[in-house]
């Protein structure tokens, strides 16, 4: 295993650990999800470069586009949550169903 692969696995597990530890605020969960997606993007890019294929790099662009869409949807949900309830706590998400 290369050192880059080990670093991306470490970043991925740090993102998972951040989600498990910081379950109180919605913004911290969104940031940890972005960390997971960035580490996945980096590992797929390194894998495509090591495989010497340019076809796999288009999958990375699709992943990056979908992660930007996920971030914008999450931020819009957080803005709606903070405007209506003056809080970004995860416990207030259940109130949005009413």
From Swiss-Prot:
Entry-linked InterPro entries: NADH_UbQ_OxRdtase_chain4L/K (IPR001133), NUOK/Mnh_C1-like (IPR039428)
Coiled-coil residue spans: none
Keywords: Electron transport, Membrane, Mitochondrion, NAD, Respiratory chain, Translocase, Transmembrane, Transmembrane helix, Transport, Ubiquinone
Compartments where found: Mitochondrion membrane
Gene Ontology biological process terms, A to Z: ATP synthesis coupled electron transport
Principal subcellular localisation of the protein: mitochondrion
Membrane topology (UniProt): Multi-pass membrane protein
Molecular function via GO: NADH dehydrogenase (ubiquinone) activity
GO CC annotation terms, alphabetical: mitochondrial membrane; NADH dehydrogenase complex
EC numbers on record: 7.1.1.2
Reaction catalyzed: a ubiquinone + NADH + 5 H(+)(in) = a ubiquinol + NAD(+) + 4 H(+)(out)
Membrane-crossing segments per the record: 1-21, 29-49, 61-81
Class of enzymatic activity (EC top level): translocase
Function statement: Core subunit of the mitochondrial membrane respiratory chain NADH dehydrogenase (Complex I) that is believed to belong to the minimal assembly required for catalysis. Complex I functions in the transfer of electrons from NADH to the respiratory chain. The immediate electron acceptor for the enzyme is believed to be ubiquinone.
Family, per entry: Belongs to the complex I subunit 4L family.
Protein name: NADH-ubiquinone oxidoreductase chain 4L
Originating organism: Patiria pectinifera (Starfish)
